[in-house]
């Protein structure tokens, strides 16, 4: 090569450089000589680059300044460019439509450099010509080559020129050396927001050299990328700031200041050369500068740029020493800055994609172009996650293989910081290979990671940052040019060894050990086993195991079956679905509590951020659950199923959970088995979980078999969820139990009591409400719990019996951390069984409902609770419990009643104490009992001295007593004068007043003294109430059935009867017939059996008749039917029952700290507004056994029954508890039938030893005080039999069975008793007080009720009243005018009513005598009152002994019984009989209603019913004669004898039946007269007698 060529190239290189400097852009260097010497260089200071000529694709350069530029010309002909202080300010361009591509920029730069060296003409002309050339096509090298060849006439010349240009380019690049220092590039991301960040890239040095074989090297040292927060420019009149158009103020002109920074620097430099303010500004900017990334040494070596036609680069080798990434600062970049950066990236990617798409559509060679990248080697990467967390990645290598695949590896990945520790042993840790079809990764060593709370917090911030970036990217990429999908999708495969992840908690490590797993993007992620260990300083336990985990990331959402919060079928569409075969969990309860507390701290990281991020986003989707529906074609109809979209879904085949030491070691462990589980997280952050099988058991060595706690009840055909959990987007948690039985064991209370810690014991006096609210937040998330078709099984403490509460639909809700909840249960059925071991589940049978299930398993349905509302609240430091029940119904037999009562008592812990803890029998200091006694009090001298005074004091004359008596008598008279009548007796209408009315309760009516009142809690004690409870029951109905529910009871009674039969048989065989003894037995303290050989069969028949209500003298009873009767025998009805409970806060000091005070523990007030006992015994004609005594002075708003109980601890440090009782009962009306009374005594006296509650320390309640009011009773008693054996044995109470009482007056006087040892002593004391009082003082009132003399006594009392009133009025007024009229009215009313009532009784008695006479002569007697189908339906009715008087057709025609329950004749009301079609008898036995029932209200009605009765009985007599006539005609024997027989049969009926009708008609007429005279009498009759009307 000629010597002049390097010098020309050197000159052209110099010219090219100078052309880029605006200061020398117009200088002509064509005749410039270059000298070779030591000072052959040019130096420039503060150089501004030509921004118009310097174009970089997708970037607008706003400023380019070089502080110092040195151009050196070397001896070898090269050019060295040394620069320092390079500062550039650029703005990325967001629009890619008119921007230049990077390839165009490179081609243009090379063309400029080559043309500047080959043109020997005017360089400016050459430069301008090449500048005007079209070199901006996409295929730059081929188009440029064609343009050059077309401009040359000869091919040889073109080839020569091309070689010269390539040669010149290679020489120029080989002789060119560039070394730049202190290069700063600032990118203004958002030019419209002055507060936005500026990204600064600083290069400490950069060097470009070319070595042998055209190998180019770019060496960059200390690259720093920082984020600068702009400082707001203060307002100034010289430099106004406009936010609306920042670009105009920043980039106004290239000759003036082109940035906020440079304009300030230049203006300040012109004013002051020393530039003190610039330094201050730079320092302030440095304070706001955050370093994001640092690269210590970056070396890039490549081949290429050797020809103008071939500008490709190949064999690119990148070598990086250290990379420092400040991740914790990157994640804090402002959202606006981050969004702008992503917008730029997405825009440029879209432009490059568009170019690549165009290029791919053009013809390309079959051979794929190899990648220009050869290898990348990064020695070390430092990831700074926080101030104390640094993750180090070493030896990251990437290498291009011959088969166009890319291999990469990571040597190590570790961290030794306290919040995060990562370690492994084998190197390299990760290797992989990328091909156009797949990416294969292989982790060659086990990875051990330990992370703390701070580490998770930093990782979560990174996760949020990445999610935010992806969200911005997805939003920006919408609407961009769609990418052309490749034919083959690249798959990702990962093979990993075991990974160990440990979470660091304050007291333990939670380690997750993941077995080697495989991931295939085309298939799924499969993990064989995941174990979770809990590492304590002393031990390590496995708490969780998950096996066979499969996670699938689906391209299209998978449709899964689910349920909504009403347990209706729904659909869930999920893109990520996981399946776990089995989950096993085992941990202690205390460890779970600690783990939950520690994990909750981690959970705050997620909840706080999610609440802030999803506030606006969830508004549109909130409530979207189950609002959409999908129509699914099912058979021949459409089924609409609600749908939901989920981010993640999980199916777990089996879950085994074991929690040990929940209460203490004695409790054992609780194990749960849940199968067929489903879990999903929806798009709007809702959580759905359900399981279709659930079983929870308690296991402990003390139990032979596992103790069931919770399980599925019925095997339904439709497999519905049994447990459903739904957390809504607003945070409300809803839990549903379906078809589940839950067990409660009272034995748990004993374990709980023994395991109460000292801390809880010391805080026993702390209010319950304060305990609930202690250390709890003021608000929480709402929750709701539902139980559908569930059952609650209650196991008592000592008994084997069990009560089941079937919950049809129970709903409860409240808010977490707040002691407030509401409960609503609509229908609850009660079941009872005597021994739970008799409960045998039939698993193979399908039951339609829970009620049928328990009824078929040996349980007895004893009642139902309708509409229960329960409320828990807190007020004034006390816990409020409010329960409201609409109705409670109980149906009980004697044995089930005892079981029910004893079970309710035994549901609590039987807390008893020995006598040493209840009493102090030995005193520490002796007491002198004679200390305060005056020994001279009874001396003769003292008595004589006070004798005179004592004589006067011995008798007190109370004058006011006589005055009060006089006032009382005057009051009685005034009452008579004002009302015109005396107060009538409720049953007989007799007067209760007179001139001198004995006030027997006068002394008892005095107000009790202050010391006699019960110790009612004071206001101060009311403030110390810990728990307030109230129970309001609108109605309680208790039905008492005869018979027995339990098989054990029935079998025992039957065996006892058989045993008596055998004993009598043996006694008869061993002795003579006359000496057979009487056998007796007492069963359950309720049934007394006495029989001999002759009446064993009668005994069975009587027992069967008493229980079932059927007396059949002709049937042979070989076995007693002891099952519950078909209908109840008695009904107890309570209305408006209210129970008020108060539990007071008391201290429990020991003896040393005691002040010997008395504590009121709790108080219970039970009130019943109205109660009645209904008599439904078949042999009884009476209606109400107990009811309110009408027309007695009793406040309408006061309850009929009030019981006030207070439990008092006399000495605070002793455990003895005493009871204070106060009883108030309203006046009562009693209608006592002997059969009903015996049934109630037998029912309530039943005692089964199996249900006796035996305590460790038997305790009898000590009644400190008992008080009751005066109770007025009005008694009707109907005896039916007399127990002569009991009378002979001395039971004087049997004498009552000789007399019938009607309206006897009894007053149980007010009693106050102290110091009673139990209720048995209370009963004896009350008998000892009330019985003598009645027999000595109230015999007139009792004898007044004797039935034979009652009417005569009432008439006599009326005559006495008339005479007495007349005499009194005559003495006062002197004449008898007005008083005679009033007294006569009273006498007439009283005597008329009593005369009529007496006539009614006489006619009714006459009717009974006539019916008995008819029956004696072969008639039906009293059975003729009703129709018996069994008698009229026999074919041989004429010859039968039980032949009916009327045939069926006739009775139907006459009485119109078809379609009606009661008999009616010609639209008349029924007479005096009724056919009870629901009779408990097996042979349609009728229930005979008393002739006194359903009396006519007045005389017209009485006459109407009298006519109906007479007509009816006349029809019966006529039918009997007509029937006899027909039988005589049908009799084949004929003859006078046969006719006489038929006439003899019909004669009694034909003669007596009209008499019966006449007596009944007279009775009805008299009843109408009596009720018309006394309007209140009919109300009393309705209370007393059963009615045959449907509306009764």
Swiss-Prot record:
A Pfam family annotated for this UniProt entry: ATG2_CAD
InterPro entries from the UniProt entry: ATG2
Main location: membrane
Subcellular location: Preautophagosomal structure membrane; Endoplasmic reticulum membrane
Annotated positions of the Phosphoserine modification: 236
Family: Belongs to the ATG2 family.
Membrane topology: Peripheral membrane protein
GO cellular component term, pick one: phagophore assembly site membrane
Coiled coil spans: none
Keyword vocabulary terms for this entry: Autophagy, Endoplasmic reticulum, Lipid transport, Membrane, Phosphoprotein, Protein transport, Transport
Disulfide bonds: none
Chain intervals for the UniProt region annotation (Disordered): 264-286
Protein name: Autophagy-related protein 2
Organism: Saccharomyces cerevisiae (strain YJM789) (Baker's yeast)
Known role: Lipid transfer protein required for autophagosome completion and peroxisome degradation. Tethers the edge of the isolation membrane (IM) to the endoplasmic reticulum (ER) and mediates direct lipid transfer from ER to IM for IM expansion. ATG2 binds to the ER exit site (ERES), which is the membrane source for autophagosome formation, using basic residues in its N-terminal region (NR) and to the expanding edge of the IM through its C-terminal region. The latter binding is assisted by an ATG18-PtdIns3P interaction.
An annotated Gene Ontology molecular function: phosphatidylinositol-3-phosphate binding
Superkingdom to which the source organism belongs: Eukaryota
Catalytic reactions of this protein: a 1,2-diacyl-sn-glycero-3-phosphocholine(in) = a 1,2-diacyl-sn-glycero-3-phosphocholine(out); a 1,2-diacyl-sn-glycero-3-phospho-L-serine(in) = a 1,2-diacyl-sn-glycero-3-phospho-L-serine(out); a 1,2-diacyl-sn-glycero-3-phosphoethanolamine(in) = a 1,2-diacyl-sn-glycero-3-phosphoethanolamine(out)
Any Gene Ontology biological process: autophagosome assembly
